[in-house]
Amino acid sequence: MKFTYLVSLAAFAVTALGSRPTPPNLEFLFSANLTKGPAYIYDQSDAQIKALQTLTGGIIAGPNFDGTVIGGTALSTRGADGTIRADAHYLIQTSDGANILVTESAAIPYVAVLFDTSSEKYNWLNNVTAWGTPPNLNEINFLEYWQIE
C-alpha cells in the first residue's frame, strides 16, 4: 500500500511539473481618480515610516459602472529601502445609488483589489479579484483596475 501511494505521488509530481499554469486574462473594470487628505505619520523609526491618510473623494469611470468615492482610509508603510506597502478601504457610490466597498492591499505600484456589495446589480463584483496600477508612476492618485479572469 505504501508503494502504491509513493508511485501515485510521484506520478502526480511529474504531471504537475510537466504542465504550465495558464496566465490570467485581464479585463478592464474602471479607472479611479482618487482625492486624498493629508497624511498623518503615526510611527517613525530608522527602519520605516507608517502613515494614515484619508481618502476624501474621487471619480470612478468604467464600462460597467461609474460613480464617486464617498470616503475611506489608507494605511501605508515606507521601508528604509524605499518600498511602500499600503492597505486601503473606501466606499464607491455608483451613479445609480449602489454602494460598493473596495479593499486594497498593495506593494506599490501594484494593487490587489476585492469588492463587497449587497446590490443585486453589482453582485458579480463580490466574486471578482482585481489588479490595479497607475498607468503613470508620477500620478499615483489615478489608477486603472483590471479584473483577473
Curated annotation (Swiss-Prot):
It is an enzyme of class 4 (lyase). Glycans are attached at residues 33, 127. The keyword Lipid biosynthesis does not apply. The extensive N-terminal loop participates in forming interface between the subunits of the homotetramer. Transmembrane segments: none annotated. Its EC number is 4.-.-.-. It catalyses: 2,4,7,9-tetrahydroxy-6-methyl-8-(2-methylbut-3-en-2-yl)-1-oxo-1H-phenalen-3-ol = (2'R)-atrovenetin. It comes from the Eukaryota. Residues 1-18 form the signal peptide. Keywords: Glycoprotein, Lyase, Signal. This is Hydroalkoxylation enzyme phnH. The keyword Glycoprotein applies. One of its GO terms (molecular function) is lyase activity.
